[in-house]
């Protein structure tokens, strides 16, 4: 279908809100983003990393999804059957914490509601926030196939989760056992490592005496957590530490509790650290747990799940753990067993959701046995069907982690999530694990715990495609997926788990490539956080500058694997770029004279400028396509920017005005054809980055098809590449630029004619200039041009050197020297004042000591800038005085 637009439908000013209004809904109505599932077309699929249904998406999500959308839009235009699958994560503790906080406002706890009612309330939250997330996806312009939207708790994915759990259990790869886990005493649940935020806390090292049972002395131990002392079951020393050789095998009388504990030898102990003697608390420290296993030590839990001390803590039973810490230290002092207290800055884990200090805690949990699964996944990386990490260095990061993996704690003491499909017989205690409920259900009690959120999201690439139904059309057609886009911070928690689960259950890699990006940081390189107050809401950016500005800024602001420094100045710069495109497009449209798509005719292209812009267009098509395949979107952005801003807008459009405003109708029509053809192709190249504005411009241009979203990706036309014209145009551009720079230096407008003398280095350069003299006349405005090997610069000439020539412009005919010197001396006075002012500040010790570093740095930059400007003006004055 060909749609023609004879009237210009583009307002004078680029207003992103107007341009973006209505387009997304139209795209959805027309089902442009709906994958066909057509086996005749080559498939291309990306599954969105499912955001948590907990609220607003942040700038990291915007970056992540923009990259995915760029890839899928590009592939759709290249003719692939493209699926960009949306979905959301139930997010376990994150969502439950939000819902509990909301209930708390009404003085209601989840226990007041009961499990079933609380889960119903959480589903209501999910529905509300899922809609909010979809609105944000719409604002960003993501080309998602909503007919395939999934949720980690929907029926299909729940079936997949049960299947995986039961299969792994039956293989002996899921087991129930005691282990040290991260425990949140406020939420009363285990936490994954990613849910623990480490903060540097100013604490204390307490040095204490542990008396030997035989009364012959004591060992000095140091701890940051005295509250765990009631759980000590040994003191460890290094087996080769000569200081303690005679004590190994003897016992300590644990103070206060008066429990006899052994002195054991273990290489875990660092001889040089502290006294070289370490208290061992197997139930409250992961390293101590391992030491305890090696020495068959008892494990004594001394806290309740809420962080208060329990009956094993003796007299401290019922106290909050931090109150107990103070009382234990006081008791050591009273017993004369306190040596000293030293300040100690150390990293302390806090719950990401509740803020509570995380307790290493021995708990009965469900685990995945990771070693065999990791080995299988690592074997995949030795085959041609490996997952390709982009950049490749992250493969080593992944492999190192998999080589050193620990068993994965998958149970969580929550109500919101996939309930563990395990039941315990009320009388016999027998365990039943199955995809379906046991018979005689009333005789069984289901496990109260739910699965770690990452358990279901690890199945995301294949569960969303219909697995465990391996005959599902989407599973057959779109799996394995093509590209996963994600941050380097979750390679361990998500990427690795998707790989081993996919290998185990499908025999395939989950995705062919994984594009790893960094973190979004502020303009100073700091991580965005609430405490710094430097977070940015992407929707606010869109409301001010438009989605296209934000998308292009995010996509082109970094290389794969690198962090992105975000600033409003960069977004504003992109907005200016789009405004330039808008204005150039309006100029083109106003000069097409109602041209229809089938009237575009490039058969009469003879002008060097026309051949040059078509050559540059094809070079740009080739570069953008090639760089896009390698995910080098920063380079794609620079390539497009240079072509559009420099080549097309600054040069070709200016050159095109000559035939457009002339009398030659054939030349006019050819120029219109080149303008329409080039702008149409350029909009298609730019479309994945800026979907809204490119659709608007493309619809106004002569075009073929219903929407740019499904228009054909531009292909290189070898017949349009003319290197001779490219060389000629490069020659003309450098000469014209040099002349313009000289005019600027001596403050002479283009309207004033000049005498121009050019001394070429060789015949080829000379011929190019002579054959294209009209360009020099049009853009340099000379009253006289001399192109000769014999010309030499006069004493009064301004000169410039370009790659193939020397350029001379005699000054006496150009300016009134006395007037120009007077003007420059006035400017010099201005810069002298600015230099004096800024140096006055920088020489003021009070300013230097009290002003923030960033302010001082800014003043130093000003000083350099003002000194440079002063030197430049002085140099120009001296040059003119010599004349």
Curated annotation (Swiss-Prot):
GO terms for molecular function: aminoacyl-tRNA deacylase activity; ATP binding; valine-tRNA ligase activity. Keywords: Aminoacyl-tRNA synthetase, ATP-binding, Coiled coil, Cytoplasm, Ligase, Nucleotide-binding, Protein biosynthesis. Its EC number is 6.1.1.9. GO terms for biological process: valyl-tRNA aminoacylation. Residues 811-847 form a coiled coil. It holds the Pfam family Val_tRNA-synt_C. Gene3D superfamilies: HUPs, Isoleucyl-tRNA Synthetase, Domain 1, Valyl-tRNA synthetase, C-terminal domain, Valyl/Leucyl/Isoleucyl-tRNA synthetase, editing domain. It catalyses: tRNA(Val) + L-valine + ATP = L-valyl-tRNA(Val) + AMP + diphosphate. The keyword Ubl conjugation does not apply. A motif ('KMSKS' region) lies at residues 527-531. Belongs to the class-I aminoacyl-tRNA synthetase family. ValS type 1 subfamily. ValRS has two distinct active sites: one for aminoacylation and one for editing. The misactivated threonine is translocated from the active site to the editing site. This is Valine--tRNA ligase. It comes from Listeria monocytogenes serovar 1/2a (strain ATCC BAA-679 / EGD-e). The gene is valS.
């Amino acid at each position: 279908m060909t749609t023609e637009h004879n009237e210009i439908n583009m307002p004078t000013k680029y207003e992103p809100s107007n341009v973006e209004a209505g387009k997304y809904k139209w795209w959805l109505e027309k089902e442009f983003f709906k994958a066909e599932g057509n086996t005749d077309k080559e498939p291309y699929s990306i599954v969105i990393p499912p955001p948590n249904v907990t609220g607003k998406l942040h700038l990291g999500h915007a970056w992540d999804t923009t990259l995915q959308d760029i890839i899928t839009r590009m592939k759709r235009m290249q003719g692939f059957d493209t699926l960009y699958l949306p979905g959301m994560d139930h997010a376990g503790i994150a969502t439950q914490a939000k819902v509990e906080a909301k209930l708390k406002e009404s003085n209601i706890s989840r226990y007041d509601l009961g499990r079933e009612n609380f889960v119903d309330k959480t589903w209501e939250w999910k529905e509300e926030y899922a809609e909010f997330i979809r609105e944000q996806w719409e604002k960003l312009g993501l080309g998602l196939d909503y007919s395939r939207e999934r949720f980690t708790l929907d029926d299909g994915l729940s079936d997949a989760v049960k299947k995986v759990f039961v299969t792994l259990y039956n293989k002996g790869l899921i087991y129930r056992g005691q282990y040290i886990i991260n425990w949140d005493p406020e939420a009363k649940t285990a936490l994954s490592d990613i849910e623990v935020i480490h903060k540097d806390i100013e604490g204390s090292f307490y040095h204490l005496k542990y008396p030997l049972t035989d009364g012959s002395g004591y060992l000095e131990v140091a701890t940051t957590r005295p509250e765990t002392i009631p759980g000590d079951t040994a003191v460890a020393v290094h087996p080769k530490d000569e200081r303690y050789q005679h004590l190994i095998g003897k016992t300590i009388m644990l103070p206060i509790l008066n429990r006899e504990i052994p002195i054991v030898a273990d290489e875990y102990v660092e001889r040089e650290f502290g006294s070289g003697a370490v208290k061992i608390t197997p139930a409250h420290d992961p390293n101590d747990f391992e030491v305890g296993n090696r020495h068959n030590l008892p494990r004594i839990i001394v806290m309740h799940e809420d962080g208060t001390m329990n009956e094993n803590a003796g007299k401290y039973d019922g106290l909050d753990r931090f109150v107990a810490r103070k009382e234990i230290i006081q008791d050591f002092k009273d017993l004369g067993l306190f040596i000293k207290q030293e300040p100690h800055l150390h990293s302390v884990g806090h719950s990401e959701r509740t803020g509570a200090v995380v307790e290493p805690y021995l708990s009965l949990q469900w685990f995945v046995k990771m070693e065999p699964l990791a080995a299988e996944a690592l074997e995949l990386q030795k085959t041609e069907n490996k997952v390709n990490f982009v950049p490749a260095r992250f493969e080593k990061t992944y492999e190192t982690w998999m080589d050193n993996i620990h068993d994965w704690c998958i149970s969580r003491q929550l109500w919101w999530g996939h309930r563990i499909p395990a039941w315990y017989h009320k009388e016999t205690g027998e365990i039943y694990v199955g995809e379906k409920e046991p018979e005689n259900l009333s005789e069984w009690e289901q496990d109260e715990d739910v699965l770690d959120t990452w358990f279901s999201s690890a199945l995301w690439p294949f569960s969303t495609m219909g697995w465990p139904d391996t005959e599902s059309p989407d599973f057959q057609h779109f799996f394995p997926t093509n590209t996963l886009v994600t941050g380097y911070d979750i390679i361990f928690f998500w990427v690795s788990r998707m790989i081993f689960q996919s290998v185990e259950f499908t025999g395939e890699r989950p995705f062919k490539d994984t594009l790893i990006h960094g973190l979004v940081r502020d303009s100073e390189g700091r991580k965005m956080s609430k405490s710094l107050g430097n977070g940015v809401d992407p929707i606010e950016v869109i409301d001010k500058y438009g989605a296209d500005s934000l998308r292009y800024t995010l996509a082109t602001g970094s290389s794969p694997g690198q962090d992105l420094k975000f600033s409003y100045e960069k977004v504003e710069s992109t907005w200016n770029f789009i405004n330039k495109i808008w204005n150039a497009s309006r100029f083109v449209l106003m000069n097409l004279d109602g041209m229809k798509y089938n009237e575009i005719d490039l058969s009469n292209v003879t002008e060097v400028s026309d051949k040059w812009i078509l050559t540059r267009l094809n070079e740009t098509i080739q570069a953008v396509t090639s760089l896009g395949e390698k995910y080098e979107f920063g380079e794609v952005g620079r390539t497009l920017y240079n072509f559009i801003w420099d080549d097309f807008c600054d040069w070709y459009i200016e050159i095109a005005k000559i035939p457009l405003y002339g009398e030659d109708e054939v030349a006019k029509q050819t120029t219109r054809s080149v303008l329409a053809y080039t702008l149409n192709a350029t909009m298609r190249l730019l479309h994945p980055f800026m979907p809204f504005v490119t659709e608007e411009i493309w619809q106004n241009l002569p075009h073929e098809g219903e929407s740019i979203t499904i228009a054909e990706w531009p292909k290189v036309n070898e017949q349009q590449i003319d290197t001779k014209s490219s060389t000629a145009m490069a020659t003309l551009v450098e000469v014209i630029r040099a002349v313009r720079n000289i005019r600027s230096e001596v403050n002479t407008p283009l309207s004033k004619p000049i005498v121009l003398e050019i001394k070429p280095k060789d015949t080829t350069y000379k011929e190019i200039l002579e054959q294209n003299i009209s360009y020099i006349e049009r853009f340099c405005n000379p009253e006289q041009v001399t192109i000769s090997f014999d010309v030499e610069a006069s004493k009064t000439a301004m000169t410039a050197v370009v790659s193939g020539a020397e350029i001379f412009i005699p000054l006496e005919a150009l300016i009134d020297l006395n007037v120009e010197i007077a003007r420059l001396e006035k400017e010099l006075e201005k810069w002298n004042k600015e230099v004096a002012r800024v140096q006055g500040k920088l020489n003021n010790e009070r300013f230097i000591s009290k002003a923030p570093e960033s302010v001082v740095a800014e003043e130093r930059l000003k000083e350099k800038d003002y000194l440079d400007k002063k030197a430049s003006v002085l140099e120009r004055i001296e040059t003119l005085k010599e004349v």
